[in-house]
Amino acid sequence: MHWIKCLLTAFICFTVIVQVHSSGSFELRLKYFSNDHGRDNEGRCCSGESDGATGKCLGSCKTRFRVCLKHYQATIDTTSQCTYGDVITPILGENSVNLTDAQRFQNKGFTNPIQFPFSFSWPGTFSLIVEAWHDTNNSGNARTNKLLIQRLLVQQVLEVSSEWKTNKSESQYTSLEYDFRVTCDLNYYGSGCAKFCRPRDDSFGHSTCSETGEIICLTGWQGDYCHIPKCAKGCEHGHCDKPNQCVCQLGWKGALCNECVLEPNCIHGTCNKPWTCICNEGWGGLYCNQDLNYCTNHRPCKNGGTCFNTGEGLYTCKCAPGYSGDDCENEIYSCDADVNPCQNGGTCIDEPHTKTGYKCHCANGWSGKMCEEKVLTCSDKPCHQGICRNVRPGLGSKGQGYQCECPIGYSGPNCDLQLDNCSPNPCINGGSCQPSGKCICPAGFSGTRCETNIDDCLGHQCENGGTCIDMVNQYRCQCVPGFHGTHCSSKVDLCLIRPCANGGTCLNLNNDYQCTCRAGFTGKDCSVDIDECSSGPCHNGGTCMNRVNSFECVCANGFRGKQCDEESYDSVTFDAHQYGATTQARADGLTNAQVVLIAVFSVAMPLVAVIAACVVFCMKRKRKRAQEKDDAEARKQNEQNAVATMHHNGSGVGVALASASLGGKTGSNSGLTFDGGNPNIIKNTWDKSVNNICASAAAAAAAAAAADECLMYGGYVASVADNNNANSDFCVAPLQRAKSQKQLNTDPTLMHRGSPAGSSAKGASGGGPGAAEGKRISVLGEGSYCSQRWPSLAAAGVAGACSSQLMAAASVAGSGAGTAQQQRSVVCGTPHM
């Protein structure tokens, strides 16, 4: 049996392996191809000829298709191998082709849809190339000397399904409609067509297949391959070759093979397993053929005789009175001396005229037809519960010599039967039955059987029209509406449930209540809001908003007032905005105070933000201006220090440097460009004009006349001759205190007043020792210094000379030539010869 199963399994596996050769196919169904202009993918005419005037192609295309199916590619390579296959069709038409008529193209060897069978598990993705070519010589190669009309590239995820997926591709000149799908071959199932299942009903299996390819056994078959039949239900010791069959194993029998076969020759026995013999009661022996209880099995004694087993299948019978024989089969009809029918010393008397032919006179204490019954007397105490009385035999109960008087609850000849006076129970309504049959009634009932319900309403009166209802050992008052309590003495207060809504006041009435409503509400329970808008109080197109005990009018543009009966003097825009916001807020259920608060905040918050922005802007601007002012003052202070340095040096070189720095606007815009080796000069990179050193008092008047021609703020540079005079009005303009945080040039050597020795030409050119002997002037000196020292210059209001004249003055001073008048002329720009 085992080798048959192995052979069956091997055959099935071999069949499955051999038949897995193709699992499904990809199908492409071409439907419509349109190329109305007869052009290729580059816009050229397929025929190569066109109308010169209209540009219309004169000829038509001869269209064939090439289809290539391959594995999924993120970027489709049109030149690589078609891994799933490719198909080249014959010429199917000209410019436009209707491919839905499959019968039309069968003669050309073209089958639509185009199928690409595969013998692997479908991966779920694909790449498809569909090309339309123009063929001029109807060759088999679609790409040789042909023109490409259209190329379609498709890459998609596609599941196995019998439904077609419709697509359409359009280009500048062409369009193509097509369908595609993937289906499994017959007997292949699953998402990849990889599960094989073939229906069969033969010796190798009996099954069908589900939609997913699972094996489903036919009725009556089971097993992995549905090759095992299901035997009849209850078949215990059997097998089957067909469904619902039960072929018994050796030693079993019956429809369900549940009966064992007895040992051969077993007569009076059973079995619980094959080939056994279990003897029935009264039988023994190897085959259960020996009778061990003849009396029980055969009952040989008749006429009431008693049988006794004597062993080995033998027995004896004890006959009842009046009978005789081995089996007590003979009835006695006379007083035979050998067989006396009367027992217990009874005397037999022949009476031929009777049926039995004799009669027995029993001895004292016995009775019965054959004197077989003992006569009892009171001495035997036969009465169990009663009183015993001796009587003559035959007069008592059943011929006995006594008679019993039974007490209540007992009966029977011997008072041994207890009477059940409570069965069935005579007491009703829950009464308790006593052994004597008397009923003890529960409270509320009376009578022999507790059948009477005591009227508990007697002596109890219900008030206010209530009705008394009698109950078991109690009563209940059914009150009329409006009253309650045990005797209906209390009035129902319907106001306890607070039926009045919206603050209404409740007044209790008889079985009713009355609500006194607040202003603005009405109804039985004050739940109805009175619509104050029902009368149309709003005029001039105003919208009425119902309120509690009031109304509110949302006025149209141009009107105001409680009822919109006044013309509005506010702007239309403001009214519309205000009332629109108010309407929306009130529609949202806000109170007037909330609406006002929201309106104030909606206006105030943007205003506060604008004010804060303005304050920040002004503070920044103020800081910027203060910074610029401090920077300007610092620059001015540094420039004055620079001029003072030139005066201190007293040389033509220093003046020339000052002229170059102060008058160099035609050069670079770098401002002051003193020698970087001079530590006493701070360079000015802003190229601003500075206040120069004052000239002599005599030059002040001439400077005032030439002030208009100066480009700077008007000032003079002293000549070398003036420098030689110790009492000259020449001085350095006083320096002002700088308010700027920037560092100033406070070198103490800058502000020494020139002495006669230090102001000589030698000192100017060589820087003699007199330069260090003059009085030191503090950088932070008083502002009145120059005005006290040179009152004439202060009166003229001259601060300095322009940079261009300063250069000329420096030249004259450096050479030592020219008079003071010439020097002044050069400085102020007035030519004097």
UniProtKB/Swiss-Prot annotation:
Keywords: Developmental protein, Differentiation, Disulfide bond, EGF-like domain, Glycoprotein, Membrane, Neurogenesis, Notch signaling pathway, Phosphoprotein, Repeat, Signal, Transmembrane, Transmembrane helix, Ubl conjugation
GO cellular component: apical cortex; cell surface; cytoplasmic vesicle; early endosome; endocytic vesicle; endosome; membrane; plasma membrane
Domain of life (superkingdom): Eukaryota
UniProt effect for mutating residue 443 to T: In strain: sonoma_009, sonoma_051, sonoma_053 and sonoma_054
PTMs per UniProt: Ubiquitinated by Mib, leading to its endocytosis and subsequent degradation.
Outcome of mutating residue 652 to A: In strain: NapaValley5, NapaValley12, sonoma_015, sonoma_016, sonoma_023, sonoma_032, sonoma_034, sonoma_038, sonoma_040, sonoma_045, sonoma_048, sonoma_050, sonoma_061, sonoma_073, sonoma_081, sonoma_085, sonoma_094, sonoma_097 and sonoma_119
Tissue spec. comment: Detected in all areas with neurogenic abilities, for example the neurogenic ectoderm and the primordia of the sense organs. Later expression is restricted to those cells that have adopted a neural fate.
Disulphide connectivity of cysteines: 46-61, 68-82, 184-193, 197-209, 217-226, 231-240, 235-246, 248-257, 260-271, 266-277, 279-288, 295-307, 301-317, 319-328, 335-348, 342-360, 362-371, 378-388, 383-404, 406-415, 422-433, 427-439, 441-450, 457-468, 462-477, 479-488, 495-506, 500-515, 517-526, 533-544, 538-553, 555-564
Gene Ontology MF annotations: calcium ion binding; glycosphingolipid binding; Notch binding; receptor ligand activity
Gene Ontology terms describing biological process: actin filament organization; antennal morphogenesis; apposition of dorsal and ventral imaginal disc-derived wing surfaces; asymmetric cell division; border follicle cell migration; cell fate specification; chaeta morphogenesis; compound eye photoreceptor development
Transmembrane residue ranges: 595-617
Signal sequence segment: 1-18
Residue ranges annotated for the DSL domain, each copy included: 182-226
Principal location class: membrane
Cytoplasmic membrane side: 618-833
Membrane topology summary: Single-pass type I membrane protein
Phenotype upon changing residue 800 to R: In strain: sonoma_002
Modified-residue entries (Phosphothreonine), positions: 666
Pfam families to which the protein is assigned, alphabetical: DSL (PF01414), EGF (PF00008), EGF_DL_JAG (PF21700), hEGF (PF12661), MNNL (PF07657)
Residues of this chain annotated as glycosylated in UniProt: 98, 137, 167
Effect the entry attributes to changing residue 787 to G: In strain: nps_6, nps_18, nps_34, sonoma_048 and sonoma_050
Quaternary state and interactors: Interacts with Notch (N) via the EGF repeats and the N EGF repeats.
PANTHER family reported for this sequence: CRUMBS FAMILY MEMBER, DROSOPHILA CRUMBS HOMOLOG
Note: Separation of neuroblasts from the ectoderm into the inner part of embryo is one of the first steps of CNS development in insects, this process is under control of the neurogenic genes.
Name assigned to this protein: Neurogenic locus protein delta
Species lineage: Eukaryota, Metazoa, Ecdysozoa, Arthropoda, Hexapoda
UniProt gene name: Delta
